[in-house]
């Protein structure tokens, strides 16, 4: 595995850094928002993402026929690392999870409707997979879709609930997993696009154990009652949604789960240890503290290398036809980095 970036990639990094310097704004970049910094939930953040589109950085890996530049996936990773390092909104959901799935599996109507808007950042999506009894096991989702007709159109009538939908209160469209075959767990899920501003959709704020939603941020539960979805808003084949979801999650795990926030938290901890005292004694001189910091620094380096491994394997999959994506490696990285972030927070 080669973890060195090419001269072209180094040039791109420099271009991104210069662009971010020129567009620095505390209303856009805020590292204190931590994991919630990546969402595009304010007018200024939406305007900033539109500027990324003007630079040609939304859809860098898309085919040219859909407005992309057919670049390597590593460029999306490099862009997100720089955005995450400053606490800025990141690409991945619209461009990656939704855009790439539409390119691969969407009908012409959906491609024409959404792909140009994604490249210009004119539409915001919420992703609806998780349910009260379907979290890590997304294939257990039960939000029900049955065949129906309304206003002369055929489609699906939806009823059920989703939870932990972070963007539902400001997004325009719902990227929704629906149970369309109750007898087949993995081959009974269909992806649909649903407008959120319609009767039958109720969005409620979720409060966490601290009494506030996700710190200073918000997540939601969404109730769907007799909502009709025309057939043209079904993504790909009926009952093939879980396959599409799995493919998209491979992308999310290495483009949206970045290393920079981990490094920031470790640096804050190290700075604290360097300056604080207990009973007049510097805690940096405590051998137990030093051992713990060394262990955390080692684990942070492991997380960095695991992420780069996924990037390297993804580049190989892009370059060599027939090479499978690093599904296992990306899952390992996501799990390790998440668990390590918890250990770092507890330290």
Regions found by a protein language model. Name each.
Residues 28-38, 278-279, 287, 301-347:
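C-terminal helix-coil-helix/basic helical segment that borders enzyme active sites and/or dimer interfaces
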Residues 134-137, 156:
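Hydrophobic, small-residue-rich alpha-helical packing segments that form membrane-like cores
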Residues 143-147, 266:
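A structural signal for short hydrophobic beta-strand segments in well-ordered beta-sheet cores
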Residues 154-155, 159-206:
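A short core secondary-structure module
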């Amino acid at each position: 595995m080669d973890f060195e970036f090419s001269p072209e990639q180094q040039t791109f990094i420099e271009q991104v850094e210069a662009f971010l310097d020129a567009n620095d704004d505390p209303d856009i970049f805020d590292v204190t928002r931590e994991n919630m910094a990546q969402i595009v939930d304010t007018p200024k953040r939406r305007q900033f993402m539109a500027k990324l589109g003007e630079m040609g950085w939304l859809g860098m890996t898309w085919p040219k026929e859909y407005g992309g530049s057919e670049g390597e996936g590593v460029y999306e990773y490099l862009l997100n690392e720089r955005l995450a390092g400053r606490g800025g909104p990141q690409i991945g959901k619209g461009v990656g999870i939704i855009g790439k799935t539409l390119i691969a599996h969407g009908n012409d109507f959906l491609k024409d409707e959404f792909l140009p808007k994604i490249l210009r950042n004119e539409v915001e999506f919420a992703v609806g997979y998780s349910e009260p009894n379907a979290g890590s096991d997304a294939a257990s989702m039960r939000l029900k879709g049955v065949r129906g007709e309304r206003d002369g159109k055929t489609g699906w009538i939806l009823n059920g609930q989703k939870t932990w939908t972070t963007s539902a209160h400001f997004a325009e469209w719902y990227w929704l997993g629906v149970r369309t075959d109750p007898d087949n767990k993995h081959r009974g899920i269909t992806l649909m696009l649903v407008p959120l501003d319609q009767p039958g959709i109720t969005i409620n704020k979720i409060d966490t154990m601290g009494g506030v939603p996700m710190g200073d941020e918000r997540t939601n539960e969404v109730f769907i009652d007799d909502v009709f979805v025309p057939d043209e808003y079904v993504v790909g084949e009926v009952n093939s949604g879980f396959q599409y979801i799995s493919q998209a999650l491979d992308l999310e795990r290495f483009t949206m789960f970045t290393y920079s926030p981990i490094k920031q938290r470790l640096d804050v901890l190290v700075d604290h240890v360097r300056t604080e005292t207990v009973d007049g004694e510097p805690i940096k001189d405590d051998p137990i503290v030093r051992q713990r910091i060394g262990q955390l620094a080692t684990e942070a380096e492991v997380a960095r290398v695991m992420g780069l491994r996924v990037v390297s394997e993804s580049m190989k999959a892009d370059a060599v036809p027939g090479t499978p994506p690093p599904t296992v490696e990306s899952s390992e990285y996501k799990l390790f980095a998440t668990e390590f972030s918890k250990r770092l927070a507890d330290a």
